[in-house]
Amino acid sequence: NNSKKLDNIIELISNSESEILIFAENNYPFLINDLKLEAIQNNIKNKQTVIIGGTRFNKNNYFNTLLNINKSKINYFDKKILVPFGEFLPLRNYLKNIELISGPNDYTEGKIDRLITLQNKIRYIPVICYEIIFYWKLLDKLNYDANFIINITNDIWFGKFLGPYQHFYLTKIRAVEFNKP
């Protein structure tokens, strides 16, 4: 259940000495605007950052979101490039009787700039899932100031097929293209 999943996340955070902990896309088990975010923030050590993905709800819209949480602040980045038929139904007005997506009907594209600063003034480009394949969407003057790229994803649904491996290698290619680890 979701409470047990959150307890496991909190336990991992509490027991870790790492400065940055990165969890998968949609790993946060509740809607992000839920007060349970405080439970994560309260268990973060000083100079520690947790990066985790989840679903955010705001003004009747759902967003696939990356959270950057430290002891004093929570930043978020909403996915800008959504997966057709997975995160939204193209031509919904014509196909409104088709229910392909479990959960919210459609996610909404994010509008926030792509750069997050960690506590130690290091900056990274947040990327969610398959956004990494659209290199021209990452070519933003703002991103040239980034120190590295973080791509959170949940490729478990691919199983043992090629998808996760292709995703991993595309991420490596982007890092080389942008000269970022």
Please provide the spans of the model-predicted regions.
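Solvent-exposed soluble domains appended to multi-pass membrane proteins
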Residues: 7, 11, 15, 22-181
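A solvent-exposed beta-alpha-beta segment
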Residues: 4
